[in-house]
């Protein structure tokens, strides 16, 4: 792919996202989703590797089906109510179809099958876009229609996503697949609270985006596509590996790191809504995710493979500093002290 095309595609992603999140009309929102889909496909397949082309094909087919469902849902609602306004989703069939369509776009269980495979076939920075930016427009549609959605259905999908994301990530060795199942698990936390507190769901997504971006950028810096590559990178980038360990623990939701805050607030809100069994279930299921985060952290810092080379330069290999990675990692680790202020806002 021509390198000059990359900025155009990234700008198209920004344009599509802006159109979707700022529109109140279903057709405009659908147009933004389609712009996003068409812009990300060349970024997925730019390496021309057969796996990348396969990932792009899977992504296109899945997103095309989801977009058709979004359009069909909005048309059904307009037929029944005469309204094209996104917030006026009142028809029960339309609500069900929209929930299924957005679940496909986000990769929620039981429509998650495409997401790990597409992420595994994509470059690390494209995988970052798929895990963060590409989830924002569909999530915005869910937030705008949250009052019309079925809480029981979303709770069931959320618990299933948290369980499957943790369970399937246990035996993975590829970092992109681990982060894909991590994304599915985090989407479960967002989905379970979305109907009861949309602001808290949005806060959880923002913090997830910050932490996941820090992990992807750190992995891209050390070129780690699997656990063994993380294992041997310590001798070259010890500071970055230590930071990566802390960000992974933050993603796991361990105090006193940033990732603990949204899970704490979600469990508190679920308890207020008299959903204590659901709060207990999702908290217990998140322990599955904790295991593979700990395994990643263990490989990144605690283990050190036998090193037969006596060449000292590898211990002092200079890497160009990355300011965005440093900022995102700092936010991923140090935001918890601000939680009382954030809680007051929410």
Curated annotation (Swiss-Prot):
Q: Name one GO biological process term.
A: mitochondrial electron transport, NADH to ubiquinone
Which InterPro entries does the record associate with it?
Complex_I_Subunit_2 (IPR050175), NADH_DH_su2_C (IPR010933), NADH_UbQ_OxRdtase_chain2 (IPR003917), ND/Mrp_TM (IPR001750)
Name the Pfam families on file.
Answer: NADH_dehy_S2_C, Proton_antipo_M
Q: What is its EC number?
A: 7.1.1.2
Q: Which reaction does it catalyse?
A: a ubiquinone + NADH + 5 H(+)(in) = a ubiquinol + NAD(+) + 4 H(+)(out)
Question: Where, per UniProt, does this protein localize?
Answer: Mitochondrion inner membrane
Which residue ranges traverse the bilayer? 25-45, 60-80, 95-115, 124-144, 149-169, 178-195, 200-219, 247-267, 274-294, 326-346
Give, as one word, the top-level EC class: translocase
Tell me which GO cellular component terms the UniProt record holds.
Answer: mitochondrial inner membrane
Q: How does it sit in the membrane?
A: Multi-pass membrane protein
Keywords assigned: Electron transport, Membrane, Mitochondrion, Mitochondrion inner membrane, NAD, Respiratory chain, Translocase, Transmembrane, Transmembrane helix, Transport, Ubiquinone
Q: Which GO terms describe its molecular function?
A: NADH dehydrogenase (ubiquinone) activity
Major localization listed first in the record, in broad terms: mitochondrion
Give a short account of what the protein does: Core subunit of the mitochondrial membrane respiratory chain NADH dehydrogenase (Complex I) that is believed to belong to the minimal assembly required for catalysis. Complex I functions in the transfer of electrons from NADH to the respiratory chain. The immediate electron acceptor for the enzyme is believed to be ubiquinone.
Its family remark reads:
Belongs to the complex I subunit 2 family.
Q: What is this protein called?
A: NADH-ubiquinone oxidoreductase chain 2
Q: Which organism does this record belong to?
A: Anas capensis (Cape teal)
Gene name for this UniProt entry: MT-ND2
């Amino acid at each position: 792919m021509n390198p000059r095309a990359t900025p155009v595609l990234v700008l198209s992603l920004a344009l599509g996202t802006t159109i979707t999140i700022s529109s109140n009309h279903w057709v405009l929102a659908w147009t933004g989703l389609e712009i996003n889909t068409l812009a990300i496909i060349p970024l997925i397949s730019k390496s021309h590797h057969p796996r990348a082309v396969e990932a792009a094909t899977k992504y296109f087919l899945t997103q095309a089906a989801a977009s058709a469902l979004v359009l069909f849902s909005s048309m059904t609602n307009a037929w029944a109510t005469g309204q094209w306004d996104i917030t006026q989703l009142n028809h029960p069939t339309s609500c069900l179809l929209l929930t299924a369509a957005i679940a496909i776009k986000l990769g929620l269980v039981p429509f998650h099958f495409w997401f790990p495979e597409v992420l595994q076939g994509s470059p690390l920075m494209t995988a970052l876009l798929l895990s963060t930016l590409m989830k924002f427009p569909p999530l915005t549609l869910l937030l705008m229609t949250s009052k019309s959605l079925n809480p029981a259905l979303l709770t069931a999908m959320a618990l299933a996503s948290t369980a499957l994301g943790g369970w399937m990530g246990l035996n993975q060795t590829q970092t992109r697949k681990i982060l894909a199942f991590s994304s599915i698990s985090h989407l479960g936390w967002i989905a379970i609270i979305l109907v009861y507190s949309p602001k808290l769901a949005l806060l959880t997504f923002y913090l997830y985006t910050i932490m996941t971006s820090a992990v992807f950028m750190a992995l891209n810096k050390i070129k780690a596509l699997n656990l063994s590559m993380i294992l041997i990178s310590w001798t070259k980038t010890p500071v970055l590996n230590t930071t990566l360990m802390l960000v992974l623990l933050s993603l796991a939701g361990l105090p006193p790191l940033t990732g603990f805050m949204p899970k704490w607030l979600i469990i508190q809100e679920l308890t207020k809504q008299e959903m204590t069994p659901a709060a207990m279930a999702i908290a217990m299921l998140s322990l599955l995710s904790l295991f593979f985060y700990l395994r990643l952290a263990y490989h990144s810092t605690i283990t050190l493979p036998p090193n037969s080379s006596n060449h000292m330069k590898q211990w002092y290999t200079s890497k160009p500093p990355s300011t965005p990675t440093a900022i995102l990692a700092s936010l991923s680790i140090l935001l918890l002290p601000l939680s009382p202020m954030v809680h007051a806002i929410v």
